[in-house]
Design a protein with these regions (language model features):
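Short glycine/proline-enriched loop/turn "hinge" motifs that connect secondary-structure elements
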Residues: 130-134, 209, 314-320
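Hydrophobic helical h-region of N-terminal Sec-dependent signal peptides
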Residues: 6-7
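C-terminal accessory segments enriched in acidic
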Residues: 1-3, 13-91, 215-379
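N-terminal cap/lid segment of alpha/beta-hydrolase-fold proteins
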Residues: 104-115
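A short loop-to-beta-strand scaffold at the N-terminal edge of the catalytic core in hydrolase folds
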Residues: 114-123
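Phosphate/oxyanion-binding active-site loops and adjacent basic polyanion-contact surfaces
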Residues: 112-114, 149-152
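Active-site/substrate-binding loop(s) of hydrolase catalytic cores
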Residues: 133-140, 150-276, 335
Length: 379
């Protein structure tokens, strides 16, 4: 694989047109390129890189920044391909066949503690890849937060594939899908709820009550069960920061996080825990859970509690982003096809549900905490 330093060196000091390339660099470039052939066969690992990098244009008109960017694209695509191979192997062990990972245009900005890319896809309907769609509602779909809950991972990947397969169905809708928030836990044998540091990513968000309540809840309510360990401080884990990054960057109007095996829909957000006197905004936000339910064989909706450091607390309660937790009824991988048939209509309805809001300002008003536990909420 061409390394960044090699490309930059070639651009800055490369041979003049017609001059032979130094012998020690020649093996890095296909022979057909060196001969000036027009039908250059690009190796698999370079398929996403501009063909001109392999022709004579390599030494003509390409900037150092272009070369660095191309090298970075090669590196990222190679890491994504490696991850997809590992996911495919894990899928085969679960009798799921090949995953949808390698068929979709993932990207990543962070890696896990063990170096696995934290994948996401910013889907923008028929205008895929564009970011200038301010009128579009944005839905964030999360899977694999607790990877021992196997069925949500399958459902999240299949939903991403459905977006790709029928783009007209979701035209004018933006969906950001992160199907495997905790890859390290997924690749453990057996799969584990926590990440490699032993932290529950759904108890590690920097909620206002984290310093005062997270450890108390863990010790008293969970008897210090290591599967629910919230970490030594909030927002310490790559998987937690990854989810916060997605919320900051894409400003979602609604969030669907897929879990198992409790068997219900839980809503957190505007109007949660209110029995009457809801505003029209609160009513419309709460209706998101019931829309998903009606399109999923009337799956039951419960007003479940939220925990210190949880996504529902962080996004739904504190930042008023309508957040639905879809709890499948089993983690058994044999039910993956059943859950796809049952819940794809509900996920589709969630994306199409008209609800526009702005969270970006609230993201900057998150609670600030100190190691001593003092909390000061910015206005």
């Amino acid at each position: 694989m061409l390394q960044c330093g090699v490309i930059v060196s070639l651009v800055m000091t490369g041979p003049a047109q017609g001059e032979l390339m130094p012998k020690d660099l020649a093996p890095l470039v296909p022979v057909s390129v060196l001969s000036g052939a027009d039908d250059v066969s690009v190796p698999t690992e370079f398929r996403s890189v501009s063909r001109r990098l392999f022709g004579r244009e390599l030494f003509e008109g390409i900037s150092v920044f272009d070369a660095i960017g191309a090298a970075e694209a090669v590196r990222k695509n190679s890491r994504i391909a490696d991850l997809c191979e590992k996911i495919d192997a894990r899928y085969r062990s679960l009798s799921w066949g090949r995953s949808q990972c390698s068929t979709l245009p993932w990207t990543y900005d962070r890696v896990s503690e063990q170096g696995h890319p934290l994948l996401y896809w910013d889907y923008s309907g028929l205008n895929e890849g564009l970011s200038d769609l301010p009128s579009d509602e944005t839905t964030l779909v999360l899977g694999g937060v607790h990877p021992d809950e196997l069925t949500p991972i399958n459902l999240a990947f299949r939903f991403a594939q459905a977006l790709r397969d029928d783009r007209a169905l979701f035209a004018q809708h933006r969906v950001v899908v992160a199907p495997l928030v905790n890859p390290d836990g997924f690749f453990s044998i057996p799969a584990r709820r926590t990440n490699v540091n032993g932290v529950d990513l759904n108890r590690n968000f920097a909620t206002r009550d984290w310093w005062g309540a997270a450890w108390t809840w863990w010790k008293n309510r969970r008897q210090s069960d290591p599967r629910h360990f919230p970490g030594f401080a909030p927002d310490t884990e790559e998987g937690t920061r990854f989810q916060v990054d997605l919320m900051r960057r894409f400003d979602p109007d609604k969030i669907v996080s897929i879990h198992a095996p409790l068997g219900f829909l839980d809503y957190d957000g505007p109007g949660d825990n209110k029995r009457k006197n809801l505003s029209s905004f609160e009513k419309k936000a709460r209706d998101l859970a019931y829309v998903v339910s009606r399109n999923s064989n009337n799956y039951r909706v419960l007003d479940f509690v939220f925990y210190p450091g949880s996504l529902g607390n962080f996004a739904g309660n504190e930042r008023q982003v309508p957040t639905v937790t879809l709890e499948l009824s089993s983690t058994n991988p044999r039910f993956a096809d059943k859950y796809w048939r049952e819940f794809f209509p509900g996920l589709k309805a969630a994306v199409k549900y008209e609800f526009k809001r702005s969270v970006l300002a609230r993201m900057d008003n998150r609670a600030t905490t100190t190691p001593s536990g003092t909390i000061c909420c910015q206005d």
